[in-house]
From Swiss-Prot:
Claim: Kinase is one of the keywords in the record: no
Gene3D superfamilies in the cross-refs: 3.30.1390.10, Single helix bin
GO molecular function: mRNA binding; structural constituent of ribosome
One Gene Ontology cellular component: cytosolic large ribosomal subunit
Subunit description: Homodimer. Part of the ribosomal stalk of the 50S ribosomal subunit. Forms a multimeric L10(L12)X complex, where L10 forms an elongated spine to which 2 to 4 L12 dimers bind in a sequential fashion. Binds GTP-bound translation factors.
Keywords, ordered alphabetically: Ribonucleoprotein, Ribosomal protein
Domain of life of the organism encoding this protein: Bacteria
Source species of the chain: Prochlorococcus marinus (strain MIT 9313)
Protein's UniProt name: Large ribosomal subunit protein bL12
Pfam families: Ribosomal_L12, Ribosomal_L12_N
Function field: Forms part of the ribosomal stalk which helps the ribosome interact with GTP-bound translation factors. Is thus essential for accurate translation.
Family according to the record: Belongs to the bacterial ribosomal protein bL12 family.
Record GO biological process: translation
Amino acid sequence: MSKKTDDILDSLKTLSLLEASELVKQIEDAFGVSAAASAGVVVAAGGAAGGGAAAEAAEEQTEFDVVLESFDASAKIKVLKAVREATGLGLGDAKAMVEAAPKTIKEGIAKNDAEALKKAIEEVGGKVSLK
């Protein structure tokens, strides 16, 4: 590379995200181009090269399964009540679910709901994991 392009690259590395976004808009206006069209090509090429799997892994998980792993024997009734409250199951079904631990209690729920349910069950003596 030339000294001039090296200097430009070094300057670009110091930009914040907001400044970089503003720079892209200015370049689009000045040269009459769109960065969106070329970005789509880069994403498509990355997906074809196997980079898509890495990108998917980097995405934050949005749905969780709440799994009752185990519980303290002395806390069985409290765990049973917490499971009934969370699932709306009857006493017999909730009891069967708790006794079958490890068992999935809820599937595909939002992160906040999953964490709240995990906290509620752990507070009464259950051991819960989110998957």
